[in-house]
């Protein structure tokens, strides 16, 4: 089987001359086809749907000042929470417990889905069967 491209011209059924480029010519000489489209420019640059008007653009100095103000506000909130008795370690413990709860809930929902599939019913029916609320 010959894998090289033939440079011989061929005639199609409509008697049009067709030629296949060889080797390097395949990359450079091949005709690129533009896909037909009802839109005007098919090969135009990507244009984001989110347009930022010129008036909304903030200078770097204004952005830094805004961020510093936000940091001061957050520092004040942290200080207030510490005065109220909240500790970072306690917050981290609560976050870890929430992650564990979410993992257990995901496993439970997965099991309910499998049981529903085996029984040929919906998980909604199983929630009522096991005495669970739909928003649990």
Swiss-Prot record:
Residues 61-92 form a coiled coil. Keywords: Coiled coil, DNA damage, DNA repair, Nucleus. GO terms for biological process: double-strand break repair via homologous recombination. It is found in: Nucleus. It holds the Pfam family Swi5. The keyword Coiled coil applies. InterPro entries: DNA-repair_Swi5 (IPR010760). The keyword Nucleus applies. One of its GO terms (cellular component) is Swi5-Sfr1 complex. Residues 1-17 have a biased composition (Polar residues). Its main location: nucleus. Residues 1-43 are annotated as: Disordered. Disulfide bonds: none annotated. Component of the swi5-sfr1 complex. Belongs to the SWI5/SAE3 family. Component of the swi5-sfr1 complex, a complex required for double-strand break repair via homologous recombination. This is DNA repair protein SWI5 homolog. It comes from Anoplopoma fimbria (Sablefish).
């Amino acid at each position: 089987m010959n894998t090289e491209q033939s440079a011989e011209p061929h005639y199609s059924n409509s008697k049009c001359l067709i030629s296949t480029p060889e080797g390097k010519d395949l990359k450079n000489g091949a005709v690129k086809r533009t896909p037909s489209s009802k839109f005007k420019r098919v090969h135009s640059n990507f244009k984001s749907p989110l347009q930022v008007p010129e008036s909304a653009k903030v200078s770097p100095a204004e952005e830094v000042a805004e961020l510093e103000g936000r940091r001061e506000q957050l520092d004040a909130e942290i200080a207030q929470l510490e005065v109220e008795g909240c500790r970072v370690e306690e917050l981290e413990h609560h976050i870890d417990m929430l992650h564990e709860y979410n993992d257990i809930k995901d496993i439970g929902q997965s099991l309910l889905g499998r049981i529903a599939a085996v029984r040929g019913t919906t998980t909604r029916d199983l929630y009522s069967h096991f005495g669970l609320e739909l928003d649990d």
